[in-house]
C-alpha cells in the first residue's frame, strides 16, 4: 500500500524522500514496479480516480461519507473506511468549517412576538414537505459592501424554497423570499413559519402576509440561535462551501455565485446527511414516490 502512495505522488516528490518518510527501501519500491499489480491495487487505482472526481465536483468540500455515497450512486459500492483511506493517502480532505456570521437580527423592537411552536423539533423529515418553513437572514461581505441574503427552508426536505438578496435588511427583503417560496410551493393553510425575533419578521407587514395565506408564525426564544438551528446550519454550509473561497469585488458577482450555489448545487445535487445522503430535490422525489 505504501508503494502505491509513492507511485501516485512520484511526479510531485522525490522517490527517496517518500521512501524515507514511509519507512520503505528505495530498492524494494523499484522492485515492486516490475511485479504485476495486485487486484486490490488495481481496484484502488480505479476508485481513486472516482474519489478525486467526486471530491473536486463538490468544490473540495466533501469528506469520506459523502464521497462514498457518490461512488455508490455511480455503481461503485465501496466502504466509507476505504474511501477515507484513499483520500488520506492522496492528501484529500474536506476543508474545516469556520463561522463568519455577521449579526443581522434586530430584536430590540416593540412588535408582537409569536410563540415558539417549533421548540427545536427539527426532525420532521420523512413525513411531508410544506408543513414547516424556517426563515433567516445573513450578511455576505463583498468589496463593494455587505449583501444581505434572506432564505426560506422547508424543514421536511431541507430545500431552500425561497430566497432574496438586497443591499440592506428591510421588510421587502424578507417578504420577497417568502413570496418566492409561496409561489413555488403553494402550501396548504396551517403551515408553521419559524424565524428569529428580528424586526422584519415581527413587522406588521410580514405578519399580515403570513395571515393572508394561512401560515402560522413561530419565533425563537430571545438570544437562542439553536432555536433556529436548521437555518443557521444552512448558512454555515454556505459559508463553508462557497463564501470563504471568494472575495467578490461587487455585490452583483456575489449574487450570481449564490444563485448558482442554491439552484445548481445545494437543492439538486448536494448530499445532506440528515436526508440519508441524498440531495433535497432527490429526497422530495422519494417522498412523492412513497406517498
What are the functions of these language-model segments?
Residues 1-291:
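Charged DNA-binding/catalytic regions of mobile-element recombinases
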Amino acid at each position: 500500500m505504501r508503494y502505491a502512495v509513492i507511485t501516485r505522488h512520484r511526479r510531485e516528490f522525490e522517490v527517496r524522500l517518500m521512501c524515507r518518510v514511509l519507512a520503505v527501501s528505495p530498492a524494494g519500491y523499484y522492485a515492486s514496479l516490475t511485479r504485476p499489480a495486485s487486484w486490490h491495487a488495481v481496484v484502488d487505482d480505479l476508485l481513486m480516480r472516482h474519489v478525486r472526481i467526486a471530491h473536486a465536483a463538490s468544490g473540495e468540500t466533501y469528506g469520506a461519507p459523502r464521497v462514498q455515497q457518490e461512488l455508490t450512486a455511480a455503481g461503485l459500492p465501496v466502504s466509507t473506511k476505504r474511501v477515507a483511506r484513499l483520500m488520506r493517502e492522496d492528501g484529500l480532505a474536506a476543508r474545516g468549517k469556520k463561522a463568519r456570521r455577521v449579526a443581522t437580527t434586530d430584536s430590540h423592537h416593540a412588535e408582537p412576538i409569536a410563540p415558539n411552536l417549533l421548540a427545536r423539533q427539527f426532525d420532521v423529515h420523512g413525513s411531508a414537505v410544506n408543513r414547516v418553513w424556517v426563515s433567516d437572514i445573513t450578511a455576505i461581505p463583498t468589496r463593494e459592501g455587505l449583501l444581505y441574503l434572506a432564505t426560506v427552508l422547508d424543514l421536511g426536505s431541507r430545500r431552500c424554497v425561497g430566497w432574496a438578496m438586497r443591499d440592506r435588511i428591510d421588510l421587502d427583503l424578507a417578504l420577497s423570499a417568502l413570496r418566492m417560496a409561496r409561489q413555488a410551493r403553494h402550501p396548504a393553510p396551517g403551515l408553521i413559519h419559524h424565524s428569529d425575533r428580528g424586526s422584519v419578521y415581527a413587522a406588521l407587514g410580514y405578519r399580515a402576509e403570513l395571515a393572508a395565506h394561512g401560515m402560522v408564525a413561530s419565533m425563537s426564544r430571545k438570544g437562542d440561535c439553536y432555536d433556529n438551528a436548521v437555518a443557521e446550519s444552512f448558512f454555515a454550509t454556505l459559508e463553508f462551501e462557497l463564501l470563504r473561497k471568494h472575495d467578490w469585488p461587487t455585490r452583483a458577482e456575489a449574487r450570481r455565485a449564490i444563485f448558482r450555489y442554491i439552484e445548481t448545487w445545494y437543492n439538486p445535487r448536494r448530499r445532506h446527511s440528515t436526508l440519508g445522503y441524498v440531495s433535497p430535490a432527490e429526497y422530495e422525489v422519494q417522498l412523492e414516490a412513497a406517498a
